Every structure is written in structure tokens, then in C-alpha cells.
């Protein structure tokens, strides 16, 4: 969703700071911030609208990086998980589950939430480091961390904690 809490404004402002040499940013989705974003985005930003999941996965696989500039504590960091599953590093705000899903310098880079200058610096760093991310390790991490068995174990841990709290 193109909304404040997802950090779209931070992304657009970072691309403004990067100037005409910025890499192409492709923004998928729709939402309340869409009109503002289109009005303020530099030419290096493209808006696709809503995409089918398969198309989005292909786009992630072809991308140099995925961007997750979230300004809120998300319950599950879906974009980093999907990006890592196809071997794409992630530029993520260092906040909550989004930040925790990225290991700095291993499978992506962090930046301060809501800080367009810090995001622009992370983009520049990504452009300068070349292909130094371990794509195989990213995919293995995603498969180990985001599978049905792991999700079941985590869910059962949460349920047990809830039951323990209700019985105290």
C-alpha cells in the first residue's frame, strides 16, 4: 500500500536527493499517498499500480535490491522474506521485524526509519559495493526461516505464552 506508514514519502524524498543518477525505483501498489508520490517523484521513479503476485515476484528477482522503508512495527516482514527467497538483497528501515529480517552487509542494508538522507546513503552504498551479497545464503535463510514447520513452531510458542498468561 502506498501510505505514510509504509515509508513511501521517505523513498520519494531519498530519490529526489539522489538526483538524475539515481537507480530506477519501481513502486508497485496503490493507496492514499499515490497522487502525492506521482506529483513529487523524480523521473527515475516508475509507478506500476497493483501487480499480480507472480509478476511482483519476477520483478523482485530481476531487481538489484528491494526497498522496505517502513515507519511502523510490522507483524511480519513479507517483502524482505519474498526478496530473500529469490536472492534479492533488501534496503530496510532499521525498525522492528523489517529491520530484524535484514542482516547488515549480508543480505541487505539498514537505514534510519523516516530518514531520506540515510536511505540515499544506503542506495549509494549499494551501488558501490557491487555483487557482494551471498545470494545462495539469502535463499537458504529464507527457506529455513519462512516455512510451514517454522511458522507452526512460532505460532505454538505464541499460543503457549497466551495460555500461560491467562492462567496466571
What are these regions (language model features)?
Residues 61-75, 88:
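Acidic donor-binding loop of glycosyltransferase active sites
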Residues 104-105, 109-116, 125-131:
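Conserved acidic donor-binding segment of nucleotide-sugar-dependent glycosyltransferases
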Residues 11-12, 25, 119, 155:
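A structural motif in glycosyltransferase catalytic domains
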Residues 80-81, 94-105, 109-110:
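Short acidic/histidine- and often glycine-rich active-site loop of Leloir-type glycosyltransferases
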Residues 35-55:
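Nucleotide-activated donor-binding/catalytic signature segment of Leloir-type glycosyltransferases, i.e.
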Residues 1-17, 32-35:
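A conserved mid-protein helix/loop that constitutes part of the nucleotide-sugar donor-binding site
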Residues 107, 132-145:
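A short, well-ordered alpha-helix in the C-terminal region of glycosyltransferases
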Residues 71, 88, 92-99, 113-114:
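Short glycine-rich donor-binding/catalytic loop of glycosyltransferases
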Amino acid at each position: 500500500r502506498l501510505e505514510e506508514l509504509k515509508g513511501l514519502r521517505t523513498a520519494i524524498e531519498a530519490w529526489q536527493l539522489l538526483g538524475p543518477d539515481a537507480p530506477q525505483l519501481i513502486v508497485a501498489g496503490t493507496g492514499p499517498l499515490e497522487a502525492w508520490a506521482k506529483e513529487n517523484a523524480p523521473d527515475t521513479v516508475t509507478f506500476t499500480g497493483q501487480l499480480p503476485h507472480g509478476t511482483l515476484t519476477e520483478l523482485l528477482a530481476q531487481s538489484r535490491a528491494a526497498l522496505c522503508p517502513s515507519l511502523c512495527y510490522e507483524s511480519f516482514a513479507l517483502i524482505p522474506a519474498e526478496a530473500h527467497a529469490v536472492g534479492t538483497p533488501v534496503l530496510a528501515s532499521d525498525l522492528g521485524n523489517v529491520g530484524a529480517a535484514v542482516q547488515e552487509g549480508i543480505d541487505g542494508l539498514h537505514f534510519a526509519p523516516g530518514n531520506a538522507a540515510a536511505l540515499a546513503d544506503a542506495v549509494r552504498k549499494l551501488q558501490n559495493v557491487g555483487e557482494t551479497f551471498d545470494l545462495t545464503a539469502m535463499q537458504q535463510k529464507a527457506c529455513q526461516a519462512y516455512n510451514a514447520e517454522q511458522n507452526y513452531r512460532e505460532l505454538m510458542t505464541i499460543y503457549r505464552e497466551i495460555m500461560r498468561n491467562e492462567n496466571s
